[in-house]
Structure formats: C-alpha cells, structure tokens
Design a protein with these regions (language model features):
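Sec-exported extracytoplasmic/periplasmic mature domains
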Residues: 57-61, 71, 102-110, 117, ...
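Residues that flank catalytic or metal-binding motifs in active/ligand-binding sites
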Residues: 9-11, 22, 31, 48-51, ...
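Protease zymogen maturation seam
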Residues: 1-11, 17-29, 34-37, 255, ...
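Hydrolase catalytic cores
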Residues: 53-57, 76-83, 110-114, 140, ...
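Extracellular/periplasmic catalytic domains that process cell-envelope and extracellular macromolecules
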Residues: 4-9, 68-71, 104-107, 134-137, ...
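Solvent-exposed, polar/charged alpha-helical surfaces in well-ordered, non-transmembrane soluble domains
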Residues: 24, 50-54, 95, 99-106, ...
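Substrate-binding/specificity loop regions of serine endopeptidase catalytic domains
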Residues: 32, 39-45, 63-67, 85-97, ...
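Active-site core segment of subtilase-fold serine proteases
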Residues: 1-92, 96-112, 118-119, 172, ...
C-alpha cells in the first residue's frame, strides 16, 4: 500500500495474524486494526504475520538478518484470528475478514497482502464485495494461491478482476508441489525455503504460498514508489507483462488473459522486480542472464471451513 513518493514512506499492509512490533528489521505504520475484536490496536496471535512482513519489507543494509523486497516499507498490521488449540481463540467470521479488507482500503492502504484462504470452492460474497470495494479505492489486493496443490480456492478465486493471485516456485524454478493452480492463478514467486523475520526478534526459514504472495506485494510497492500516480490496472499489467517464463512449462493463449502467454501451473510466469521497476522508470541496462536456475535469486493456509495459512 504505497503512499507518497519514497520507499521509506510507502505504506504496506498484510492481512493475517499481526506483526511482532519490536523486531529491529521491521517498520510498522502507526495505524493498525484487530478485525477479531473490531478495535485498535491489532493483537499478536501467533507468528505468521511477522514471517510474511519480513518478506515484504525487512530493512536492507543494516547489518542485520535479511532484506525484504521493498526494504523500509511500513507495514499496517491487521489481526485476523483463527482456531488454534494452543492459543484457544475462536476463529474470525467472514465479516471480520471483510471488515479487515475495508479497514485497510479506508486507511491509506494501496497494497493488501492476503496470505490466507478458505478451504472451499463456494464464493464468499461478503469478502468478495470487500475485495471489489478495495480495488475500487485504488488498492492492489494480493492473495496466496493456497498450499493444497489443487485449484485456487476462495476468496482468491472469487473476484478475479480485483485480485492478484500468487503461486510458489522452488529454487530450481519449478512449481512447488503444494502450490495452488488453475484458472485463477496470475503469477508465481519464490515460496520454498525463504528466510524471514520471526516473533523472537530473530529469523527463520519457511515455505508456502504465504511467502510467495509478499514477494509480489513488495514489487507492487516498488512500482508505486517509482510512480505513485500509476493506476491499479497499469500496475497489474506491469507485474504480469514483465514476468519470466520458467520451469519448462508450455504457455498458451487464453482469451481471458490479455498480458501474454499463460500457463495454469505458473500463470504468466515468475515475477521480475528489476523488469517491473524498469518498465516504470524508463530504459535501463540489460539485466544479467541468470539462466533457469533460481539458486542465484535470493530474496529478494488458516482452514474456518478449514481456514488455513498458505
């Protein structure tokens, strides 16, 4: 949710359990929300949010830990609770999720990262309406594709024109076996063995589409930092048009996919931060050829009905 002109002032949001607010590598925005209680500030329910936040915006060049995709971005933490035997907290309702998305859109968010999904193929109109509302307010709504290795579930699949759905690939450039796929998938990003921040103030290695989605949210932040006046559609087109075709997949023409050749397992392909920002900033030096291996590309599902982390 970039806001203004410089990366240090970009506002970014992630939806899920909220973020540990004392981590030296993270910058939190001074607005937060607890969708479970309907109050402010957000609450810390588990470690998932902190892990996602690090991928988006952990500080670079500070001699600590890792660097996020959009270093210095400010995170608007929004808590969404889930059923957990250890925490003993009841799951949030669909209304809580919808309210969280609307809160973000109404309080300056421009990128809404959603690293969660419901284990259902039935549309959830309340949440889909909130997604459409946020899109209409000028937000890019990013969703992880899910970790069941099956078709993308709700609500990511429920509002295709208003969401950017992200699957995961491994270090060799192939679709991760757990990554959701199908007609709703837009792009892929690294999602296996990703180093990020944790609630101890340290760092941890994680896998899942939850950690692919924030790569894309970070790139969106970089694009809007370069030109904050770009429309939602222009930003989305840049993300999809600057991808790399990877993993030995066969790409084809889909009449509903207007930004190039597409594949049901990896979408338009692997997001490319360098090419995306270059598409905004103008001609740039030719990027080095890194081949098909991602070994050189270091970073940079909750289940109500089975609300699950991705």
């Amino acid at each position: 949710m970039p806001l203004l002109f410089h990366i240090s002032t970009i506002l970014s949001l992630r939806l899920s359990i909220t973020v540990f607010n004392n981590h030296d590598d993270l910058h939190l925005y001074n607005v937060s929300y607890n969708a479970h209680t309907g109050g402010i500030p957000s609450g810390l329910y588990g470690d998932h949010g902190t892990k996602v936040a690090g991928v988006i915006g952990a500080t670079a060049n500070n001699g600590k830990g890792i660097a996020g995709v959009a270093s210095g971005v400010k995170i608007m933490p929004i808590s969404i609770c889930y059923t957990d035997n250890e925490l003993g907290i009841a799951a949030s309702t669909t209304t809580n999720f919808a309210n969280a998305i609307r809160f973000a859109a109404n309080n300056g968010a421009r990128v809404i990262n959603n690293s969660w999904s419901f284990d259902t193929s039935s549309p959830i109109s309340e949440i889909n309406n909130a997604i459409t509302y946020a899109h209409g307010k000028g937000c890019i709504v990013v969703f992880s594709s899910g970790n069941k290795g099956s078709a993308v579930s709700q609500p990511a699949a429920g509002a295709p024109s208003a969401t950017l759905v992200v699957g995961a690939i491994d270090r060799n450039g192939y679709k991760s076996d757990f990554s959701g796929y199908g007609s709703s998938l837009d792009v892929v990003a690294p999602g296996r063995e990703i180093w990020t921040t944790d609630v101890t103030g340290g760092y941890t290695c994680v896998s899942g589409t939850s950690f692919a989605a924030p790569h894309v949210s970070g790139i969106v932040a970089l694009i809007w930092a370069t030109d904050p006046d770009l429309s939602v559609w222009r930003v989305r087109n840049i993300i999809e048009q600057t991808t790399r075709k990877i993993g030995g997949n066969t790409y084809g023409v889909d009449p509903l996919r207007l930004n190039g050749l597409w594949n049901q397992f990896v979408g338009y392909g692997l997001v490319n931060a360098y090419a995306a920002v270059s598409a905004v900033s103008g001609p740039a030096p030719t990027a080095p050829n890194i081949g098909t291996s991602l070994s050189e590309v270091e970073p940079g599902d909750l289940s109500m009905m089975g609300l699950g982390y991705d």
